[in-house]
Amino acid sequence: MLEQCSKNIEKLRNKCPLTHCITNYVTINDCANVVLAIGGSPAMANEAPEIEEFVEAAGVTIINMGTLLEDQIEPMQIAACHTKKTNTPLVLDPVAVGVSKLRNDITIDLINKSSVDVIRGNMSEIKAIANLFNITDEKSVAKGVDVSSDDIITKDNIKSNASLVKAVADKLNTTIAVSGAIDIISDGVSIYLIDNGEEVMSKITGSGCMLTCVIGSFCAITSPLEAAIIGSLSMAISGELARRKMEINNEGSGSFRTYLIDMMYNMNDETIMKYGKLYKLE
């Protein structure tokens, strides 16, 4: 699977699909730049009257709920419906679901209205979705946009968390990509783990939003499962390499953020094969 997924980087850059991002104003610039770096063509169109046209023109649409402004809800709902109508891939990042009733209601609505291909979130967010759709009664105490300390993925809880991720993917007929120290990805049938986690990622804002957009770009040219895997691998390995360069130069998180996009720009199949730590959970 590692070699198979790695070939999608060149395929993405050759096709350069329009990647339509309905995202938040905190991270919009970094999201656009990381899509360009990995090989996509970003369009950050958010106005309701033009959403259907952008969905039809794009290879994929991404919905990010980070700054859930009132005037963003209608465009998100239009995108959810129209991607289903046009069979355009849809990636959802339900940022901070579980924190407020509004976010819970919008998440349920978007999932029910669409045929979402990938849902990308941290473990707290995925547990919240599992609870909203009656897949589990386990409560998760969300910490704003960040993962709760109780939900951090470790080698001790990986199997139970992976089992839940698979159950959510199966129930919602989608692919779930959970980012953390260890990434968990499942399409409801198979479960894959990525052990390239980089702690410095949590010291910059937007790393999760960027990852969602990268996965989205890959969704335009390959299956949701492969897109989630190669997107997560590319971002995780870039984080490792960016941290090394930061430490060599005795720099900090600001430089790490720049190096992260640099490493995404230079990412290729050879780097994936050299550094990728991808495992199938049996």
Curated annotation (Swiss-Prot):
Q: By its UniProt entry, which InterPro entries does this protein fall under?
A: Hyethyz_kinase, Ribokinase-like
Q: Which residues bind ATP?
A: 120, 179
Q: What superkingdom heads the lineage?
A: Archaea
Catalytic activity annotated for this protein?
5-(2-hydroxyethyl)-4-methylthiazole + ATP = 4-methyl-5-(2-phosphooxyethyl)-thiazole + ADP + H(+)
- Name the cofactor(s): Mg(2+)
GO terms assigned for molecular function? ATP binding; hydroxyethylthiazole kinase activity; magnesium ion binding
| Residues the record lists as binding substrate | 44, 206
Per the UniProt entry, the Enzyme Commission number(s) are: 2.7.1.50
Does the record carry Manganese as a key word? no
Respond yes or no to whether keyword Nucleotide-binding is given for this record. yes
Question: What pathway is it annotated to?
Answer: Cofactor biosynthesis; thiamine diphosphate biosynthesis; 4-methyl-5-(2-phosphoethyl)-thiazole from 5-(2-hydroxyethyl)-4-methylthiazole: step 1/1
Alphabetized, the UniProt keywords read: ATP-binding, Kinase, Magnesium, Metal-binding, Nucleotide-binding, Thiamine biosynthesis, Transferase
- What would be one Pfam family of this protein? HK
Q: Which GO terms describe its biological process?
A: thiamine biosynthetic process; thiamine diphosphate biosynthetic process
What function does this protein fulfil?
A: Catalyzes the phosphorylation of the hydroxyl group of 4-methyl-5-beta-hydroxyethylthiazole (THZ).
Question: What family is this protein classified in?
Answer: Belongs to the Thz kinase family.
Q: What is this protein called?
A: Hydroxyethylthiazole kinase 2
Q: Which organism is it from?
A: Methanosphaera stadtmanae (strain ATCC 43021 / DSM 3091 / JCM 11832 / MCB-3)
The gene is thiM2
